[in-house]
Amino acid sequence: MADAPNQKWAGDISYVWTREGWIYLAVILDLHSRRVIGWAVSNRMKRDLAIRALKMAIAFRQPPNGCIHHTDRGSQYCSHDYQKLLRQHGFKISMSGKGNCYDNAAVETFFKTIKAELIWRYPWETRRKAEMAIFEYINGFYNPRRKHSALGWKSPVAFERKVA
């Protein structure tokens, strides 16, 4: 993991079924606290989805040069525009070994958690309803209130406050 905020970030994309079709969720986590610091939803899994999540994280955290940014080797993360944005902000780029999902375990765990606690519990009528529920889950529950055993049973926000 990381000893302090803004040392290591990780990102990935997952999907959610609605009666209108799929939506895709891109997230960026700070690996120190497991806090979701950037996220975006779209009905297409294109590079702009990943870029929007990264831009949100950058605007929110303003990371120092040398912050490690880890993802898998998906086309969105390998794209010229995404890589350029990382370089412009001084990130040290890290990518998973080919076909190794365990390299990004923290983000995969987040997706497992949001799916078990929210996504799989309801039949999502519309993409918009799913997106709003994801917003509420991340900002109203996961970051400020969801306790993690790895964080000494603190939420990501409380864990970061303790460090500050």
Predicted regions mapped to residue ranges:
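Charged DNA-binding/catalytic regions of mobile-element recombinases
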Residues: 1-164
